[in-house]
A protein has these predicted regions:
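Alpha-helical scaffolding within the catalytic cores
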Residues: 25-29, 63, 88, 135-142, ...
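N-terminal carbohydrate-binding/catalytic regions of secreted carbohydrate-active enzymes
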Residues: 29, 34-110, 119, 130-137
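Acidic-and-aromatic substrate-binding clefts and catalytic sites of carbohydrate-active enzymes
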Residues: 54-56, 77-89, 115-117, 130-133, ...
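Noncatalytic carbohydrate-binding groove/subsite architecture in carbohydrate-active enzymes
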Residues: 130, 161, 167-293, 299, ...
């Protein structure tokens, strides 16, 4: 009798284990998401005013997420944990999943990392870290365990190692410390085993350019992360390297549109070259793992550097071309591109409404889709959807001729305007 009971117990235990495995086998993991064109990525911030003092509400975030879902975005990237926005994002996704079990949205959760004295009146100490970093990491752990079905990736830092971030950058050993900490928590089953850990940073920080970044600590970091999340911004780089942007002399007889289109293809190729530089360095140290594009984008307005008085790079047509080209390339190569970004955010340069940082969105703050998404409106993709309670319309009232009044041909390369 005891033997019979024991056999029944073993069979029941086996059944339970198989059931649990079946449930786990249905889990969508970072490994399944990244590099999969079915899971398009986007950088998200939902702030609607020129300050972050007013957080987007759960209802407002739900509006945003429905818009994102309409254009097939299924994973969003966030940046920090010291604002209520991320909590509202997670609550909004949870509510939308309850309302519609087929709704899919996942999160690459950003934990902000600073050096000691960052954003203070004291000189930054880049080799030491802010006490706030430990709080960010702990909060990331807590939220990931609370929302494991939503949070699939933790990113330690945002452009936290690149040396032009002079007010806050840290040395790679600080990022490595926290990546190793999170990886150890996974081993201890204190974080989901399928959670992926990375850091999101400029291509330079990942070894894709200047040799000053090629350090032993960087090599250890590359080995420690589950994948590399690199950033590339041709529109920023052309400000410092003007030879990469503009019209070549042998293109002088092209139409204005063809001159612009050709320049945008070169901008895409420049971004690809930075991506390839990161891959090349990674492989040179004997590592082979996924490299995704954690950020790239193109601003549509600027009063100084990239506008009419500058390089003539910022407008909706060029931004639309860049978006299209980068999506086509990344999808073909099966590389996840977290495009920057979905909505304009005017808090980034709150005292300068026409500052370029405010206008990277595919939508402006007047609930209008920019030129990159006009075709989605034509197809009725946003029908019934709202932002701030108002329907989504086109910029320029949908008048392409009016749009072209703001599109200028870039300068000739190696020539004065």
């Amino acid at each position: 009798m005891k033997k019979f009971v024991y056999i029944v117990f073993i069979l029941l235990l086996s059944f339970v284990n198989k059931s649990l495995f079946a449930q786990n086998s249905n889990e969508v993991t970072a490994k399944m998401i990244l590099g999969n064109p079915k899971y398009q990525g986007m950088c998200y911030g939902g702030y609607r005013t020129n300050t972050r003092d007013k957080e987007p509400t759960v209802s407002e975030v739900k509006e945003d997420l429905k818009i994102l879902a309409a254009i097939n975005i299924k994973i969003i990237r966030t940046y920090n944990l010291h604002h209520e926005e991320i909590l509202n994002v997670l609550k909004a996704i949870t509510e939308l999943k309850k309302e519609n079990p087929k709704f899919e949205m996942y999160v690459m959760l950003g934990a902000w990392i600073d050096c000691k004295n960052a954003w203070t009146e004291f000189p930054p100490i880049h080799e030491e870290e802010s006490q706030r970093n430990a709080i960010e990491i702990q909060k990331a752990v807590e939220l990931t365990n609370q929302y494991p079905e939503i949070i699939k990736i933790i990113s330690v830092g945002n452009e936290a190692m690149v040396k032009w971030a002079t007010s806050y950058y840290v040395t790679p050993d600080i990022i490595l410390k926290w990546v190793n900490h999170l990886q150890e928590l996974k081993k201890q089953e204190k974080l989901p085993k399928n959670l992926w850990i990375t850091s999101s940073d400029n291509y330079l920080s990942w070894g894709g350019g200047d040799a000053q970044y090629h350090t032993e600590d960087l090599n250890k970091l590359i080995e420690a992360v589950d994948f590399i999340s690199m950033h590339t911004y041709p529109i920023h780089d052309e400000r410092f390297f003007p030879e990469i942007w503009g019209v070549k002399e042998n293109e002088a007889n092209l139409s204005d549109k063809m001159k612009i289109d050709t320049a945008m293809v070169r901008a895409r190729d420049y971004a690809i070259s930075q991506y390839n530089g990161v891959v090349k360095y990674m492989k040179s140290i004997g590592v082979n793992k996924p490299v995704e594009m954690g950020e790239t984008g193109w601003t549509t307005i600027d009063a100084i550097y990239y506008g009419v008085e500058g390089s003539k790079a910022a407008d909706e047509y060029k931004a639309a071309q860049y978006y299209k080209l980068m999506r086509e390339w990344s999808n073909k190569q099966k590389i996840t591109c977290f495009y920057f970004e979905v909505f304009d955010e005017n808090w980034k340069d709150g005292s300068n409404p026409n500052g370029y940082e405010n206008h990277f969105g595919l939508f402006n703050l007047q609930n209008q889709a920019k030129f990159a998404l006009w075709d989605k409106i034509d197809k009725g993709i946003f029908k019934g959807l709202t932002r701030n309670g108002k329907p989504i319309t086109k910029t320029y009232d949908g008048n392409e001729k009016a749009l072209w009044q703001d599109v200028k041909v870039p300068r000739f390369i190696n020539k004065q305007n």
